[in-house]
């Protein structure tokens, strides 16, 4: 086995970094999820995750030098959604979107600021997996949420015609990119030390 192959293998430090930043990111997600008790904020959740979560995620990217780290963090998010009461759908969704984000950052050889910002735009798409049951299985989705009240349910239904899902995907990417630019501005010295330009 070559030194290059060994160098591309994830080690204990890499997994520690994944765990730390996944925990920070998850806390942000759960804090923002509380706003979902208001219908409009339920719809805006993935976009808010993109902006606010984009800041620590950009810092995480300064630690990413090997393939697999972004994908694993995305998968952790999908699994945590399932564990906290969502369906299984976010898990495969997080694998697909995490793999795309991984490829984008890898394409920049972990040194491109443009790739870092675009990756930060793509990464929060994992959270859109939470919306699929809402759009595709409304009756089942609200069956377990009757305690929210009929007015809440009616408002959410009005806000979520099927075409809105594609708007949410685009808005999430745009807001993630905004979060990337904010992270770039706030964490300039970290990127300089990591050699990302």
Walk through the language-model features, giving the residues of each.
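Short, charged juxtamembrane terminal tails flanking transmembrane helices
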Residues: 1-6, 12, 187-197
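Hydrophobic transmembrane alpha-helices
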Residues: 2-68
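Hydrophobic alpha-helical transmembrane segments
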Residues: 15-20, 47-48, 70-75, 88-92, ...
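Aromatic-anchored segments of alpha-helical transmembrane domains
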Residues: 22-30, 76-84, 122-132
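Short helix-perturbing small/polar motifs within transmembrane alpha-helices
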Residues: 27, 94-129, 180
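Membrane-interfacial segments
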Residues: 32, 36-40, 64, 68, ...
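Alpha-helical membrane segments and adjacent membrane-interface helices in multi-pass membrane proteins
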Residues: 43-103
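Membrane-embedded alpha-helical hairpins and interfacial helices in multi-pass inner-membrane proteins
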Residues: 116-188
